């Protein structure tokens, strides 16, 4: 069983020194979170200051939580909704024209439950272009969601999903192809 007295964060795991990490958390809790909804460019600017790769015309709400922005890539015209949590222990990439709806949680980190010291690990998440994750979707570490895929509200994604499909459920399963109407 686990003995947390032996737990430690691996050297370099955060991708930034302690000062950078603490400074980001202070900025996120204040001038990022307190900014008016319409100041998308301001929040994109702050994220870029901390090393995020942010495309043009990104919509990111002030209530979004990002653990380490230097591990985040947002493509052009990506939208990230209210109360989304981007747990960037590992890299998160969200493709152009993709929507991550409110209260969704993208989780790149976990612990080894078999390890006595509860070893922490991180695996990247990739959301393709033109995807839509509806409200309150959970995405597990290591998942890739193919271009054009829709994941229904309150779904949990534990395995990678192919391109151009509609999925839902816990665990999320493909229910049909996504066909463009225009």
Task: List each model region and its residues.
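Acidic, glycine-centered active-site loop in nucleotide-sugar glycosyltransferases
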Residues: 163, 168-171
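Terminal amphipathic alpha-helical/low-complexity segments used for targeting or macromolecular assembly
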Residues: 1-52, 56, 97, 130, ...
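Beta-rich strand-turn-strand
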Residues: 135-159
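A short, terminal or domain-edge coil/loop segment
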Residues: 13-17, 111-122, 149, 164
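Flexible, glycine/small-residue-enriched loop-and-beta-strand segment within the central core
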Residues: 35-44, 61-74, 79-144, 170-171, ...
């Amino acid at each position: 069983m686990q003995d947390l007295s032996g737990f430690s964060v691996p050297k370099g795991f955060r991708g930034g020194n302690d000062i950078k990490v603490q400074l980001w958390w202070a900025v996120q809790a204040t001038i990022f979170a307190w900014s008016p909804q319409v100041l998308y460019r301001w929040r994109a600017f702050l994220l870029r200051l901390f090393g995020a790769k942010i495309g043009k015309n990104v919509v990111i709400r002030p209530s979004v939580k990002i653990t380490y922005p230097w591990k985040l890539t947002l493509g052009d015209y990506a939208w990230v909704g209210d109360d989304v949590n981007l747990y960037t222990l590992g890299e998160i990439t969200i493709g152009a024209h993709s929507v991550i709806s409110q209260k969704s949680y993208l989780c790149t980190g976990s612990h080894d439950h078999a390890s006595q010291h509860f070893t922490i690990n991180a695996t990247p998440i990739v959301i393709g272009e033109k995807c839509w994750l509806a409200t309150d979707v959970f995405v597990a570490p290591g998942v890739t969601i193919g271009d054009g895929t829709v994941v229904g509200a309150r779904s949990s994604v534990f395995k990678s999903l192919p391109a151009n499909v509609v999925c839902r459920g816990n665990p999320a399963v493909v229910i049909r192809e996504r066909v463009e109407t225009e």
